[in-house]
Design a protein with these regions (language model features):
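Active-site entrance/lid segments in N-terminal catalytic domains of soluble metabolic enzymes
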Residues: 3-13, 18-24, 28-193, 200-229
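Single conserved hydrophobic/aromatic residue that forms the stacking wall/gate
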Residues: 233-242
Length: 242
């Protein structure tokens, strides 16, 4: 059998196949099933400060293409809507039960030094292998001056990355937003701030369709809609310099 062991940003893993931060990595039972199936690691769904956000429902929209139904999914989900303590306890159990797997925790808090320095020791105490700074969420959180609102300003990317590197022993991965004219700028900023790696990419702003009766983007909730995220490979340019 081939040896697929690898080290990514200082994080060891039995294979390079990881689940990205997303709805499937929001709960212990989902992550446990994935690791039992052989995945080499997971990035836990983005954690934030308490009180937890409130997610709407339904928050998914389907894209059909060339006669194929549900060729892609759009989502307007925010970060985890569960209490921080609940996630922390589950992450700790997962790492104890799967010590050889890469467990990375995605984080998003206000662009305030005290907020970042406060949450890092809590996450580090789980025994996880690293953190991912979510600078890419294109909807819901950017309106709160988080997510893509940080990722679109290279100076902020470098500043927050440096705060985290000064505070934690864990490897720091920076997740970039593609919703920017030149993705190289925040990539350079992350590396200047000391990032151990960059993660490509967060979701691209998109509209899957329009409810012609309500004249709102899909998915629509209570007669209202918004643009959401649609994943797309966008990795060539940022990888060339490194």
């Amino acid at each position: 059998m081939a040896d697929l062991r690898c080290t990514i940003g200082g994080i060891r893993s039995p294979n390079p196949f990881w689940l990205a931060s997303a709805p499937p990595t929001d709960k212990e039972y989902n992550v446990r099933r994935a690791l039992e199936a052989g995945w080499g690691g997971v990035v836990w769904k983005t954690l934030g400060e308490d009180p937890a956000v409130v997610n709407v429902s339904s928050r998914y929209g389907a894209v059909s293409y060339a006669g194929q139904r549900m060729a892609g999914l759009n989502n307007i989900e925010l970060i985890t809507d569960r209490p921080l303590a609940t996630n922390i306890a589950e992450i700790k159990r997962i790492k104890q039960d799967f010590p050889d797997r890469a467990i990375v925790v995605s984080l998003m808090v206000p662009c305030v030094e005290e907020s970042w320095r406060a949450i890092l020791p809590i996450v580090e105490d789980t025994g996880c292998d690293g953190i991912e700074l979510n600078f890419g969420c294109p909807h819901g959180m950017s309106e709160r001056n988080m997510g893509a609102a940080v990722g679109q300003v290279p100076e902020y990317v470098e500043m927050v990355t440096r705060w985290c590197k000064q505070t934690t022993r864990m490897p720091v991965i920076v997740k970039l937003t593609p919703n920017i004219t030149d993705i190289l700028a925040p990539a350079h900023a992350a590396m200047s701030g000391g990032a151990d790696a960059v993660s490509l990419i967060n979701t691209i702003q998109s509209i899957t369709g329009v409810d012609l009766d309500a004249m709102t983007p899909l998915p629509a909730v209570d007669g209202q809609g918004t643009h959401g995220g649609l994943s797309l490979i966008h990795i060539s340019e940022p990888t060339r310099p490194y």
